[in-house]
């Protein structure tokens, strides 16, 4: 309810919606009751529109922003590079693609209907994988010289955390790859803390 959002507006400098919500609640209504200027995880339609239009409406989504921070930290210039994002969710895939475009990369988004995905991914200089399936990207997708950012967080058959990229097969081939755990997830937490406390 927007009245709840307005009522909290003067009290709280930042707003974060914890999910999943109870099933009886309408997630879209609740997300859009947040104030875009205080929505630290880009849940509102207004916040997300800022990502797609290039206008600074509220805050960027934390996980795609973490991917950009990793590229920046290691001095990886995206200008003119071919980038592939595996996954088209509104949480990671689509916003990550838009952020890469803003960095002047030439971006392709792969998804479950992509034909010959390994060949498409192999052409990329930068690969962001947010497919939501453990080890879906293996050595057949990759080549030397690539930078791979693995956003996935899964539990394998042994009960261990793993990413969407088969790390053991990928790591010897590519130039650089983020591990799971200890990669994007850790940076996402740092990005969230930075956004949550900025100008608060």
Per-region residue spans from a language model:
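Short amphipathic alpha-helical face segments that pack within enzyme cores
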Residues: 66-69, 187-195
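Single conserved hydrophobic/aromatic residue that forms the stacking wall/gate
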Residues: 1-12, 199-200
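Conserved residues at the C-terminal ends of beta-strands
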Residues: 18, 86, 180
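Glycine-rich phosphate/diphosphate-binding loop of Rossmann-like nucleotide-binding domains
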Residues: 61-137
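Rossmann-like adenosine-cofactor binding region
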Residues: 109-184, 188-192
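Generic secondary-structure signature for well-ordered alpha-helical cores
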Residues: 35-39, 48, 72-77, 101, ...
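Anion-binding alpha/beta catalytic cores of soluble intermediary-metabolism enzymes, centered on
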Residues: 14-82
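Short acidic/histidine-rich motifs immediately flanking catalytic phosphotransfer sites
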Residues: 10-13, 123-125
